[in-house]
Amino acid sequence: EEALSVLSSKIKTLKSYEVAAVSGKLTDVETLYSAKLLFDKLNMHHYDCRYNFSQVPTKNRSDWLFNASIEGIDKADKLLIIGCDPKREVPIINARIRERWLSGFLDIRMLCVPDDLPYEGIHHGNDISLISQKTFLDTLQSFFSNAKNPIIILGDTIIKSNQGKLIHSQVKYLANKLNVIREDWNGFCFLTTDASRVGGLDIGFFPKKDGYCANKIKSRLSKEIKLLFLIEADDFVFDTSNSSDLTIVYIGHHGDIAAPLSDIILPSSAY
């Protein structure tokens, strides 16, 4: 009760644009939804569930979904993996790919992935700029020709850079051009390692209007942002050396990295 009273008093001293929130990889959707309702009611627009600075687009739901579904891997006959590490990031999907490959019905090509994955395929190196080159498109057109259930997996890891939106757009273009996306099949699969990411994007926990994304929030801490909510965002990395003018509120149950950095802690349920 005391913590809520202190927080309420703090919010009343600030302008709406001086408050921001970032959520983490395990934040439940109910908490995110409640937080969004509160921030919207208070006219606060700086919030984001993409704590890792992912540049995944937020207009089209199909842009952030694993559209073919995990079960869909069992029907795939051609697979292109771009910018992720299924072996370490998503073992369940990795095992499914391996099982399908062992059946002899799946051909695989890879770009910007580790070379120790438990299935064989053609590696195209680690230069992501290949996706914009005509020779690579020609190669893929030959590879995907006559494919019945083709899949392209794009990892969230590779779109964290400033070129992230462009990379996503180019891969989505390839998916349409190569008939990976059809009326009866959507093989464009965006791969995130965060349990809360799809739910967060589904309910709109990302900046709109004049809101700041996680990267902009980070760059404006203590300068413009005076109050920061970390909603189980233990993996949100930022510099605390110059945060004397910043009040940090931690909402969560793990009490991991972010909790000791906080001025106010609001415990939440662990389920």
Model segments located where?
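Catalytic alpha/large subunits of respiratory electron-transfer oxidoreductases
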Residues: 1-271
